[in-house]
């Protein structure tokens, strides 16, 4: 397995790629994002925010787990970092990105996603 990437190293790459994917999605011009009218009634946007940040937390904790770092030791600092990142993205949408508008409710959905991802990671990666 020396010539190919190990699961542990791939897990880090996946977490970083997801991080970049979320950044790109959040920086995309708002008028170029498809609008599905029927989804507006269930706040689909908030579910997406929650899911993106839950996935980011799970991927990051998986990387820690596969690289033999104790998940419980790092879960709170990583959660704090991701919550800060979610708030920063909303601020950047308000100030830097074209046709994007940051919303505090999106920041809340991001944060709840981190909490959900933390719960899932604890269930998956701790004994």
Q: What do these predicted ranges mean?
A:
Residues 1-105, 111-127:
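Bulky hydrophobic segments
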């Amino acid at each position: 397995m020396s010539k190919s990437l190990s699961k542990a190293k791939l897990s880090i790459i996946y977490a970083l790629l997801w991080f970049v994917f979320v950044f790109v999605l959040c920086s995309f011009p708002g008028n170029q994002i498809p609008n599905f009218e029927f989804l507006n009634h269930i706040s689909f946007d908030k579910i997406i925010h929650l899911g993106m940040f839950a996935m980011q937390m799970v991927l990051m904790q998986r990387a820690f787990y596969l690289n033999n770092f104790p998940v419980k030791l790092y879960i709170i600092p990583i959660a704090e970092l991701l919550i800060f990142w979610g708030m920063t993205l909303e601020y950047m949408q308000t100030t830097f990105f074209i046709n994007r508008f940051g919303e505090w409710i999106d920041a809340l959905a991001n944060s709840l996603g981190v909490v959900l991802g933390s719960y899932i990671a604890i269930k998956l990666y701790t004994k």
